[in-house]
């Protein structure tokens, strides 16, 4: 974004606040926002109070007390101020801290409120030479000069920017890109910056704070706040900040924009709309009219301002919005009451109607905490007041109290209760198959309910433990927050049904008397004309019996929980809702760290000595195309050997961070020793190849020796046989010597050649050319052998690396992080230039299409509707997997008696549907379709005085300009991606896995519920939900359902791609990408300008350059040290370069001081490479030893090609062997040729 500030032209300086200039249209300081004025007044008052507190004397304290002793009368202004000062002492926590005072001082000039319809929605900030306002904040800046500016909008950074007016530039703050980890300042105090993220304690910051700046400890702005993401005890801030070269936006996952809402929610009552937070109607106070108030809330239950309306109805303050307090979190429960419901097991194996009925248990917290909902209410008294030591429960039609200390929760043993409020209990229980809740009532009787519930300890991390450790590491987890404040979670309430009670009916002389005891009673009978009615006073039904009467206690002044074990009053479901405590939040849990593995390295393997305290998971993966992945739980002390291929391996032990191993080419023997030591050396590196070569050489030597012996034997036979058959024949001297004939007498060589010339000239030439042919043959064999070995050696060492002399240059750099590419660019008239390119980071990002999100579900079962003496009918509702069924022949009973009193048949309408579980916002999986991936690479380019890192998309051609030089990167040689076309993302893990399409989920499988987002209304569900017939006599809604497919997938899922990705890829999920995959090469073309070179006349001049290698360890990262000696005729700085891939130099340039030490890395045992310093060159030759360690934790920065890599000593021995064998064969051939020539001559 080119209009963001990249330089600061105006610094901040201190000066007294001046009055408005006559020509300046800016309003006086008094028109600054009221909030800031109040803050400044509070600051001045707090500082004054602090000064008075430190410097006050005894007479001054006496003066403060004098006005109190006088009679009441109008006080002057001065004593009033003195009376107000002590009030500040009562609330010292309101005094701004040092950080807040500093920010308020700076903010007074550089930030302005943004208002929409008179309401503050955010802030704008003057930074550098720009005014910045978050783009998502509606409204205009509350300043006439700034409001009329023309703003440019950047959707990438969510900012609107404009140039600051000249008259206001002195008010702007500086900014800085330097952000060392630590604490920074903003309006509410300290901001922690660690790991590239800004965080504040949860509860600090809210909607309306968007646009506030974050300052460093000296005053410059380091970031601008846009929003926040709740992460449990901390809130991660979404900010726009500055890096060294660019502006960047940091957006944590789950970020909510902090612009204040501008919409006023409206509610309805009898077709009259009003603001929900400020109702102006008569029945809007619960204390004045409970029943109409509840009905009003039921009619607006789906309104966005429902809770504002509920708050106004409870507090009965219609004139203004009242401030909510922590002490009033229980006040919403004034509208509710506990209840009694059917419990199948009341502690002794029998059923009952219990006030301790367990409605629901949630075990979504990964720290093992259970959230239990039951029928009674904790922390409330029967008079609707708050008392955390009390439990109120339903005792018939009344409400009774019990002591909170008698509450017990049991599993396989007693649980620890950690929090209670309303209907909810937080408890940590040992693993078990049941849960029971009990308390002792006011009559000293135990009220218990028990249900079957399987629960076990959840696994956090990679070690199974039972006790929280004192020392370890913190891992992300979830827990139920111990807060009673309003949350986003809620439960449904409804008007309770009429409760049958036969105890209020009594028989008196043929009449039935109804004793109401101050209640409202609805009655019905089959006697006379007074069949049905409602009464609030005692009533007598004449000429009737109790068996023909039924009485119901009616109470519509309070809600109760919408329980499936209590019938609802009406078929049309009317409900309200209240917030529930203890929301599920993200936090961190301390987990143990197993003792570190002891590593013993071997040849291409590493042995881990493991000493686990708990069952601990060990996993490893190898790099390369053919990956190997394995994991196992280690329960006892053991040793595990893992292979270490050439590409490397990564293992993770328990909760420790992953460790990587790379093979070091170590071996026994010596590359520069005797033949058996050389064979031992190469056998350790390449056993198969060494065995094959040794066998082949041995066979060749043996065959050569056998052939030589055979030729000698044949020659001797041919030359001796004629003389043996001829009596008196004399063997010539030459033949005798060649054939080892005893007593041989032969003519001299000259006589023999003269005889051949006279008698057979053909034989003369044959005998003359034999030795010459043998000499030529030996020479050719030696040359061929030397040429062959030398060619192979040069090919292996890649002699002749890139030296470019053309104007357009091309190169191919490896797509491997940390592996440098270096080239020597030569241009006529200029000193050679060293070019180095190195991949710093790669990111393979696929194009994703979100198919749906899936998670656990919860089954909502509303209270059943029982139609007495009639038939109920189901109605279609637009809810996920909505099921409705009507069952006849039911005879429900409640604690007060039969619910229905008639001769005809009763029916029960049961309903159930599926919703996303509350845990979904913390625990869900996203199903994506992956398409073409883009490969983004960060490449560090160094040449001359240029050292810059650039980003390029190398899956195609991407041009980048670096210091005036145009570089074109890509396309990468090997298009590859680790992602399949269908992928799943779950809690930072990625899985290549197939999944059903949207709307085709199956019960019990992944995707049984599906939605586009976590709060959308397009939820699809197929969980196999079926309603069952209720048991006779009980009010309940039985159903069957397939267990959650998401939970099943969690248990059965395979290892994620994060743990087994090939080529060393690091898988990230926010966004989805594969980092640092070592696959393929990246072609580069460039056009280096002349200005990047140094002319020969300006370059340093050195001569007599020599290179001496002092020490060398091959296959080690820069394990070689060489000393360059030279004479300096003109000093300066010279580029240094190796002209061979055999060795990679660590240094790029050196200062010419006559002697320089350089470091190089090589995989060769006898490297020989040319080093150039400026225009001079020298050859470095070394004899390297193998490294001592078999396995190392870092890759070496050199060419890993080692075959055929023969050391100079091995080459010498090979030449000697070849020369000896060749000489033996040559002698045998020479003897055979001479003998053949002589025999043919005869």
UniProtKB/Swiss-Prot annotation:
Keyword Transport: yes
Catalytic residue positions: 136 (charge relay system), 158 (charge relay system), 210 (charge relay system)
GO BP term (any one): proteolysis
Motif Nuclear export signal mapped to chain: 141-151
Binding to the viral RNA: annotated segments: 82-111
Residue numbers spanned by region Interaction with the capsid protein: 714-718
Region of interest called Transient transmembrane before p62-6K protein processing, as start-end residue ranges on this chain: 719-739
EC number in record: 3.4.21.90
Pfam families: Alpha_E1_glycop, Alpha_E2_glycop, Alpha_E3_glycop, Peptidase_S3
Residue(s) at site: Involved in dimerization of the capsid protein: 184, 217
Range of residues in the leader sequence: none
Region annotation (Host transcription inhibition) ranges: 35-66
Disulfide bonds: 110-125, 267-276, 281-285, 284-316, 343-449, 346-352, 415-429, 477-589, 527-544, 719-740, 855-920, 868-900, 869-902, 874-884, 1065-1077, 1107-1180, 1112-1184, 1134-1174
Keyword Membrane annotated: yes
Annotated site, Cleavage, chain positions: 258-259, 324-325, 746-747, 806-807
PTM entry text: Structural polyprotein: Specific enzymatic cleavages in vivo yield mature proteins. Capsid protein is auto-cleaved during polyprotein translation, unmasking a signal peptide at the N-terminus of the precursor of E3/E2. The remaining polyprotein is then targeted to the host endoplasmic reticulum, where host signal peptidase cleaves it into pE2, 6K and E1 proteins. pE2 is further processed to mature E3 and E2 by host furin in trans-Golgi vesicle.
GO cellular component term of the entry, any: membrane
Location of region: Interaction with spike glycoprotein E2: 152-157
Region annotation Ribosome-binding: where it falls in the sequence: 96-110
Compositionally skewed regions (Low complexity) per UniProt: 26-42
Residues bearing glycans: 271, 586, 760, 947, 1076
Motif Nuclear localization signal: where in chain: 59-96
Sequence segments annotated as region (E1 fusion peptide loop): 890-907
Domain observations: Structural polyprotein: As soon as the capsid protein has been autocleaved, an internal uncleaved signal peptide directs the remaining polyprotein to the endoplasmic reticulum.
Note in the entry: Belongs to the Old World alphaviruses that usually cause fever, maculopapular rash, arthralgia and myalgia.
Name used for this protein in its record: Structural polyprotein
Source organism of this protein record: Mayaro virus (strain Brazil)
